[in-house]
Amino acid sequence: MPTINQLVRKGRQKPVYVNKVPALEACPQKRGVCTRVYTTTPRKPNSALRKVCKVRLTNGFEVISYIGGEGHNLQEHSVVLIRGGRVKDLPGVRYHTVRGSLDTAGVKDRKQARSKYGAKRPK
């Protein structure tokens, strides 16, 4: 615990805020074009082929975005909408593609949590 004299000399230091999604530039979502669609493997305890795409955003940033859900229709030059949200077991992936928006189709035959995957209500 500092003395009053130490506080007078130095003062308390504010914690430095680090932006977790710098490419969004304080916007909720951003549009971009896929430059590469590929699969990658997660970090140590997990094992899978995770679907990701490299996206060039309208503001010039180039980011890696995760494609959630089972199956997707994305390829190079697809126009996608990305939102913030990292994938814990994929290093460098800090964004998610929004399903059911622009060129990204919603997940087919999705019954639960449909709004997160752009699936329409089944008849």
UniProtKB/Swiss-Prot annotation:
UniProt-listed PROSITE patterns: RIBOSOMAL_S12 (PS00055)
Key words of the record: Methylation, Ribonucleoprotein, Ribosomal protein, RNA-binding, rRNA-binding, tRNA-binding
GO terms of biological process kind: translation
Gene3D superfamilies: Nucleic acid-binding proteins
Record-linked SUPFAM superfamilies: Nucleic acid-binding proteins
Key word rRNA processing present: no
Residues found modified as 3-methylthioaspartic acid: D89
One example GO MF annotation: structural constituent of ribosome
Annotated Gene Ontology cellular component terms: small ribosomal subunit
Region: Disordered, residue numbers: 104-123
Basic residues biased stretches: 113-123
Pfam families membership: Ribosom_S12_S23 (PF00164)
InterPro entries on file: NA-bd_OB-fold (IPR012340), Ribosomal_uS12 (IPR006032), Ribosomal_uS12_bac (IPR005679)
Cited NCBIfam families: rpsL_bact
Family note: Belongs to the universal ribosomal protein uS12 family.
Oligomeric and partner information: Part of the 30S ribosomal subunit. Contacts proteins S8 and S17. May interact with IF1 in the 30S initiation complex.
Functional note: With S4 and S5 plays an important role in translational accuracy.
Protein name: Small ribosomal subunit protein uS12
Annotated organism of origin: Neisseria gonorrhoeae (strain ATCC 700825 / FA 1090)
